[in-house]
Structure formats: structure tokens, C-alpha cells
Amino acid sequence: MLQNDYILRVAEDVDQTLAQIISHQDMRDYQGALSLIDEVCRQAVGTDSDFIHAISEETLLAMLTLLGVLDVQKTLLMAKLLKAEGDIYEEQGNPDAAYESYLISLNLLLEIVLRDEG
């Protein structure tokens, strides 16, 4: 029961954070949205989005893994944040940065699916 409550709280926090990011986007406050994404990344994995883009996929997955088990909630959070980041870059007219964010997000989602099947 406690674990279910915790999962629901985490899901609500993620939804609230994504709503704040979307709100910044709607106001065209892209820097505010990107700053919020960086803040949540630091809370989740201890580093900002720039570092996530600079490291290898294997290193990122290692950061999202504890005792050999992928933290699915944290991985899903990172995938959602990177997708939102890609949306912002796309709105700013930066397709290369958007593509990179989308690609990392997609790879994280695929990793969740592949590990779930295994």
C-alpha cells in the first residue's frame, strides 16, 4: 500500500512538473521551461540536460540503474523531460537540438520496453 501511494505521488509530481513546463512553453518562456527541465534533471539524476546530451547512452543508463535494475520511473521521467526539451527546441527553430533530445528520449523508452520483455 505504501509503495502504491509513493508511486501515485511521484506520478502527480511528474504531471505537475510537465504542466509547468508546458505553461512556460505556452507563454513562449523557453528559457524558463529549459531551466525547469534542468532543475528536474538535477533532482532526478544529479546533473543537467547538457551533461545528459554529452554522455553515452550506456553511461546514462548506468545513472538510471540501481543494483542492476533499471529505475523505470526515473527513466520514464527523463524520457518525458527530454521529449519536452525537444518540443521547445523545435518551437525555437532548432531542429538539430530537437532531434537529439527526441532520440535520447526514444532510446530511453525503448530501453524500458526491452527490459520489461526480458
Q: What residue spans do the PLM features occupy?
A:
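Glycine-rich, aromatic-bearing surface loops/beta-hairpins
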Residues: L110, R115-G118
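Short acidic, glycine/proline-enriched loop segments that cap or flank alpha-helices
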Residues: V69-K74, Y89-A98, E117
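Elongated alpha-helical scaffolds
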Residues: K74-A84
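N-terminal alpha-helical interaction modules that lie
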Residues: M1-L76, L110-E111
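Residue at a conserved register position within TPR or TPR-like alpha-solenoid repeats
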Residues: H24, L82-E85, Y89, L109
